[in-house]
Swiss-Prot record:
Biased composition (Basic and acidic residues): 84-96
Transmembrane segments: none
Keyword Chaperone included in the entry's annotation: no
Family: Belongs to the parathyroid hormone family.
Cross-referenced SMART domains: PTH (SM00087)
Signal sequence residues: 1-25
One MF annotation (Gene Ontology) recorded for this entry: peptide hormone receptor binding
Cellular compartments per GO CC: extracellular space
Species of provenance: Macaca fascicularis (Crab-eating macaque)
Name of this protein: Parathyroid hormone
GO biological process: cell-cell signaling; intracellular calcium ion homeostasis; positive regulation of D-glucose import; positive regulation of glycogen biosynthetic process
Keywords: Cleavage on pair of basic residues, Hormone, Secreted, Signal
Length: 115
């Protein structure tokens, strides 16, 4: 058996080690900043990939809907407020000539219809 004097020395050394390490009941292993940043970047990447996949599926549904030639459902006229011509003006009339804007609008519409 160990003498009491030696046991007291061992206990003092053990208490000193416990108080000087300052673990406070927390795990001693901590993650480095780069590891935390890597995990954060991975989370953002996975989130963005989920969003891209969701958007791809939605666009595929729209493409399939249009490709099948399904008629578009008419909008309920009661739910939309009537538009006034003044609400549609996006650019001041003196900034563009009427002919240039109309040609561009017609070109865009014909390209959209041909697709």
């Amino acid at each position: 058996m160990i003498p009491a004097k030696d046991m007291a020395k061992v206990m003092i050394v053990m208490l000193a080690i416990c108080f000087l390490t300052k673990s406070d009941g927390k795990s001693v292993k901590k993650r480095s900043v780069s590891e935390i940043q890597l995990m954060h970047n991975l989370g953002k990447h996975l989130n963005s990939m989920e969003r891209v996949e969701w958007l791809r599926k939605k666009l595929q549904d729209v493409h399939n809907f249009i490709a099948l030639g399904a008629p578009l459902a008419p909008r309920d006229a009661g739910s939309q407020r009537p538009r006034k011509k003044e609400d549609n003006i996006l650019v001041e009339s003196h900034e563009k000539s009427l002919g240039e804007a109309d040609k561009a609008d017609v070109d865009v519409l014909t390209k959209a219809k041909s697709q």
